[in-house]
């Protein structure tokens, strides 16, 4: 009688999944609520200030999302190597990721600093003089922070790739506490307005990058950079990272370009419309937290399963994480839909802007329930498989 193959033990128990997911959930919640607090504090300076920050952030998000896609590529490669128990190549791929993102973010940051005004004019056209003045100040300082957020995203992605989401959560906590404290001190204490908000963000990102690089060099971390020579760019591992990072960056970039076009169109409708769109973008991210959390969890879970050759387990975990994402999105969007008329009163908006903001978020809630998870969570399962 032929022997039957022994079923492979689950790579991720329920406890292991919970241990991975809850720090990611807390990290996303921190990021979103601190982002809302940022908008809330800037709104106290005036609609021109919050409008300028919103316009620049739409451009910042486009740039950071495209560059951060490289971090996703590196995390996928590292998680697959870890699934195969090949720690040497996993470590080399991590070092190459730091090199690629370091060079890319420094280059982009310098270009944005040198050409800040032409870029803003080219993207947003003619906007109020006050909005343009604030926007240029905010964009210039934001560009300085690109290398630091790039290093943070690289380190966070690599820690998640090995199933350790606690470190990225702590780094996010440090960054957001510094950001919110810096906002309070610089915006309200020193009356620095938009410049204060930008400096608080920069300082938070510097601390987060330093913290996560320090944690990366822990002797027990299989993805630590063991030698400075490992950081020297090497064609083969870089091409593996880029083979996933570039398509992912183009996908993220196309979506963000669409949002940027909306922001550009909104900028022609006046300061109230820009402010309403800014607050709507900030508040709507609350409803995305469950989906965004599962998106981050997809990379290490599916990547390690496929790296170990466990396709059936990869399929099962994909369905599980998608189910959690869809359920969480439905509940979060329902809650925000009901509470939005109250939430909008937290911000210093005119009556006209408050009404527009509420309408925008309500429409977002209706579509998010049905399309967010399949648009943003599911693709990370494909990326984890190298697609």
Where is each model-derived feature located?
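Interfacial/gating helices of multi-pass transporter permease domains
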Residues: 19, 42-61, 93, 129-134, ...
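Helix-terminus/linker motif at the lipid-water interface of multi-pass membrane proteins
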Residues: 29, 33-51, 120-129, 185-192, ...
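Transmembrane helical elements of multi-pass membrane transporters/channels
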Residues: 19-38, 141, 175, 204-208, ...
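Short alpha-helical transmembrane segments in multi-pass integral membrane proteins
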Residues: 1-24, 78-145, 189-246, 302-368
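Hydrophobic/aromatic residues in alpha-helical transmembrane segments
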Residues: 22, 38, 74-75, 115-116, ...
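Small-residue-rich hydrophobic transmembrane alpha-helices
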Residues: 50-110, 149-168, 274-340, 371-386
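Alpha-helical transmembrane segments of multipass membrane proteins
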Residues: 36-40, 110, 154-158, 177-188, ...
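N-terminal transmembrane alpha-helices
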Residues: 8-40, 44-45, 61-73, 77, ...
């Amino acid at each position: 009688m032929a022997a039957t193959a022994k079923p492979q033990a689950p790579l991720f128990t329920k406890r292991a999944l919970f241990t991975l997911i809850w720090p990611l959930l807390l990290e996303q919640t921190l990021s979103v609520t601190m982002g809302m607090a940022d908008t809330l504090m800037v709104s106290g300076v005036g609609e021109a200030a919050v409008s300028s920050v919103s316009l620049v952030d739409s451009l910042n998000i486009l740039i950071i999302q495209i560059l951060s896609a490289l971090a996703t590529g590196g995390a996928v490669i590292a998680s697959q190597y870890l699934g195969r128990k090949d720690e040497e190549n996993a470590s080399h791929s991590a070092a190459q990721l730091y090199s690629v993102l370091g060079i890319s973010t420094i280059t982009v940051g310098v270009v944005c600093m040198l050409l800040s005004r032409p870029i803003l004019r080219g993207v947003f056209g003619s906007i109020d003089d006050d909005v343009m003045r604030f926007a240029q100040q905010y964009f210039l300082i934001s560009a300085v922070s690109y290398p630091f957020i790039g290093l943070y995203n690289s380190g966070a992605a690599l820690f998640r790739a090995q199933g350790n989401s606690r470190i990225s959560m702590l780094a996010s906590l440090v960054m957001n506490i510094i950001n919110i404290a810096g906002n309070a001190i610089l915006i309200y204490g020193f009356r620095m307005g938009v410049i204060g908000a930008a400096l608080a963000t920069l300082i938070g990102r510097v601390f987060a990058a330093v913290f996560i690089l320090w944690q990366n060099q822990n002797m027990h971390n299989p993805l630590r950079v063991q030698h400075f020579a490992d950081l020297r760019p090497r064609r083969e591992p870089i091409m593996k990272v880029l083979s996933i990072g570039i398509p992912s960056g183009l996908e993220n970039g196309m979506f963000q370009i669409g949002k940027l076009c909306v922001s550009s169109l909104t900028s022609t409708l006046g300061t109230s419309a820009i402010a309403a769109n800014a607050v709507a973008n900030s508040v709507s991210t609350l409803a995305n937290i469950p989906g965004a959390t599962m998106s981050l969890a997809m990379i290490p879970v599916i990547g390690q399963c496929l790296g170990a050759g466990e396709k059936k387990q990869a399929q099962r975990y994909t369905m599980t994480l998608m189910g959690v994402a869809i359920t969480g999105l439905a509940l979060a969007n329902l809650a925000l839909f009901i509470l939005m008329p109250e939430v909008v009163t937290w911000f210093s908006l005119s009556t006209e802007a408050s009404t527009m903001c509420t309408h925008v978020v309500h429409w977002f809630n209706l579509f998010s329930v049905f399309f967010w998870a399949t648009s943003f969570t599911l693709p990370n399962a494909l990326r984890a498989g190298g697609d």
